[in-house]
Amino acid sequence: MDKKEQDRLKKEAAEKAANMVQSGMILGVGTGSTVAFFIDALGKRKDEEDLKLKAIVTTSNRSKKQLESLGFEVSELADIDQADLTVDGSDRVADNLDGIKGGGGALTLEKNVAINSKKIVWIVDESKLVHRLSGFPLPVEVLPISCEQNFRRFEQEGLKPQWRTDGDKRYITHYGNYIIDLAVDPIPAPHGLADYLDHTVGVVEHGLFLDMCDEVIIAHSDGTIEDKIK
């Protein structure tokens, strides 16, 4: 599938998600190429239908700047109690709607917005669908003070760690941390791995989004749009 076709699919899925947004909502907005199409569709609804939102929170400066350029005011997560709806993308989505996220490095804020949402919808094209979580490195955000120990421990556990880099340097997250990508593929027991990472000192957050997503909007290459609801 070429990029032009992939972008067309992403745009179709994003427009369907944008039609779920209602005036008066507190909206969570994720990050990534598919979400950029979603934000464009929101802007169109704002202009054509006078869509008015109570508040918007987002997971990246890129999404924030795009929203503000379209006339939306963006709030901080601390300023809201709970989003009515959060729309985001996902790097991989399994049959049971579990996902791997964090390819763009914003996994910690993405998960914080997600857990403070009444409903979570992911928008993807069919290339992101997998039977079980696989085909994409699992991001783990780690504190610099203990990152070397974390890396060695992951090696000992057979998780195939790799430092995420930015040029010839280690990638630094919004919060000043590093990311270790785990190349274990497929992930044999996602809940077990999530529990292990949750209890590992020095791990800030990981990209396993389990039992969180309520609905996935999928754009297929044949032009059809599929809704998968948990």
Swiss-Prot record:
Signal peptide: none annotated. One of its GO terms (molecular function) is ribose-5-phosphate isomerase activity. It catalyses: aldehydo-D-ribose 5-phosphate = D-ribulose 5-phosphate. It comes from the Bacteria. Pathway: Carbohydrate degradation; pentose phosphate pathway; D-ribose 5-phosphate from D-ribulose 5-phosphate (non-oxidative stage): step 1/1. GO terms for biological process: pentose-phosphate shunt, non-oxidative branch. The active site is at E110 (proton acceptor). Pfam families: Rib_5-P_isom_A (PF06026). It is an enzyme of class 5 (isomerase). Keywords: Isomerase. Its EC number is 5.3.1.6. Catalyzes the reversible conversion of ribose-5-phosphate to ribulose 5-phosphate. Homodimer. HAMAP family: Rib_5P_isom_A. Belongs to the ribose 5-phosphate isomerase family. NCBIfam families: PRK00702.1 (NF001924), rpiA (TIGR00021). This is Ribose-5-phosphate isomerase A. It comes from Lactobacillus acidophilus (strain ATCC 700396 / NCK56 / N2 / NCFM). The lineage of its organism: Bacteria, Bacillati, Bacillota, Bacilli, Lactobacillales.
